[in-house]
Amino acid sequence: MATVELGYDFTKTYTSLTPTPKDLDNTAPKLGTIFESTDGKAYRFVLNNHSSDLVIGDVVFLDKTASYPNAVSVLNTDSCGAVAAGVMAGAAMGAIPAAGYGWIQFAGVGSANWEGTTDIVLGDSLKGVNSQVYVVKDAALAATATYVNHMRALAAYTTNAAAVGTNNVAINCRVW
């Protein structure tokens, strides 16, 4: 089900910021548009500056190498540590095509992909992984976040399967 607030469908994606004559009433929001809801969730309209399509729940990083200030990518040179490198930006809200546009959630309770080869306890801090679309347990500190931009597990996960699954998280990726 689409998340719709005040006319925004956060699962809608666009291949261009320029409307076609058939699509004048469905123009893409301005790149960088931020929407904050009354329930603490926050969204940003971004460019997927990566060569692969994103799906709902994919974790993305701020692409500071891009010419656009609101571009995201799955690439991150140091797992969101250095300001000059990638910073975890949030989770994709829809299937954003490569070089396309769509919404990411950067704050509040949401869903994100996480990798489950390590037990995750409710409240554990989750950190991004370079060149991956998921978060993992921040094993060094468990409940204390290593990085300013992080996610927090809202469920326990003890399956220890290598597969990536989408689970509930508290997203805290406000620093850009």
Regions inferred by a protein language model and the residue ranges of each:
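Glycine-anchored, exposed beta-strand/edge motif detector
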Residues: 2-176
